[in-house]
Every structure is written in structure tokens, then in C-alpha cells.
Amino acid sequence: MKLKFCGFTSIKDVTAASQLPIDAIGFIHYEKSKRHQTITQIKKLASAVPDHIDKVCVVVNPDLTTIEHVLSNTPINTIQLHGTESIDFIQEIKKKYSSIKITKALAADENIIQNINKYKGFVDLFIIDTPSVSYGGTGQTYDWTILKNIKDIPYLIAGGINTENIQTVNQFKLSHQGFDLASGIEVNGRKDIEKMTAIVNIVKGDRENE
């Protein structure tokens, strides 16, 4: 199972998370988000992430110039598109930055299968999140049974995942590759090492010291 921890805003938290056996660390470049970081801040934060952990920049309906600024000025190796980006736009990114991974976030609503089929073949990974006008980060969950028909597609489950409900999700025997957490590893809006460690232990076993 893969783990992505997202929404980091401090070097201290990035350093702590990087000691755990997680797969990706995310930074949000979207001014309407409470976890928004400038490109300068993302450069500093992402530089503290070791090479074996993917460095993800989350953007919402960006233009190509924004993508260029992120990729030219930071060590980011994955772009997570969290809006209504077009296939043509994704192909533009891939054409210019062939080594960059593209993740597409989708809302867990009645159109989920249709939207997966739309983007399938153009992105490397899906994030399936709680439907929200604020494009994620709400801490709210959704009916995970909607994911039962999604098979043979690489995706992470996001949306209010925490230490209390993550084992419930696993009882549904879904085909997900892992989880994406932000609010579920926070206390009072700040990343919490105890919660991060607890999630790692649940998902990957007691391996944080390896």
C-alpha cells in the first residue's frame, strides 16, 4: 500500500515525515487553500525531501506558465491536477516534461467511472477525493462503496482518511493502491508525528525505523 502525506507547510514537518516509509509528500500551490505555499516556499520544503520519496505539487486549473515555474524552480517530480484540466493540457505538460508524473484528482460522485475513462491513459495515478467546491482538503469522507466498481486502475483514496476510519476502508476490499492524507495527520492544523506514525503502522506495518 502506498502512502502520500499532503499539505506540508514547514521544514520541521517535512523532515519528520521523511523519516517514515511513505511514498510521496505533497505541497499545495493554490491560493484559496489554507495550506497554500508559494513556489519559493515549495522549493525550500521539497528540497528537504529525500530522493526516494516523490515530491508532489498540487495545483488547481493552472496554466502552463504556472507548471513551468514550478518545475523550473523546484525539485518537484509529480504534478497533481485537482481541477477540471483538459486532456490537451495534460498532453502539453507530458510533451514538454516527459519525465514528470501526472496525478489526477477526481471527485467520488456519480460521474467517477466516466471521468476515470476520460483521463485513463493520460495520467499516471488517480486520487479519488470527497466531492467539494474547494477542491479537496475538507477532512470530509464519502461513501467508499462507490469505489467497488473501480478495478485495474491505479488510485489512492483521499477524503477524510484518518487513524479511526482507515481500517474500515480496508474492509471493503477495494482495488486501491493506497491512501492520500492531509487533515487526518494533523492536530490544530499542523502535521502531527504521532498521527503520521500511526497511519504508517496501520498501512505498512511497524516499519518506521527501517
Curated annotation (Swiss-Prot):
Pathway: Amino-acid biosynthesis; L-tryptophan biosynthesis; L-tryptophan from chorismate: step 3/5. Keywords: Amino-acid biosynthesis, Aromatic amino acid biosynthesis, Isomerase, Tryptophan biosynthesis. The keyword Amino-acid biosynthesis applies. It comes from the Bacteria. Its EC number is 5.3.1.24. It catalyses: N-(5-phospho-beta-D-ribosyl)anthranilate = 1-(2-carboxyphenylamino)-1-deoxy-D-ribulose 5-phosphate. GO terms for biological process: L-tryptophan biosynthetic process. It is an enzyme of class 5 (isomerase). Pfam families: PRAI (PF00697). Gene3D superfamilies: Aldolase class I. InterPro entries: Aldolase_TIM, PRAI_dom, RibuloseP-bd_barrel, TrpF_fam. The keyword ATP-binding does not apply. One of its GO terms (molecular function) is phosphoribosylanthranilate isomerase activity. Coiled coil: none annotated. Belongs to the TrpF family. PANTHER family: N-(5'-PHOSPHORIBOSYL)ANTHRANILATE ISOMERASE. HAMAP family: PRAI. This is N-(5'-phosphoribosyl)anthranilate isomerase. It comes from Staphylococcus aureus (strain MRSA252). The gene is trpF.
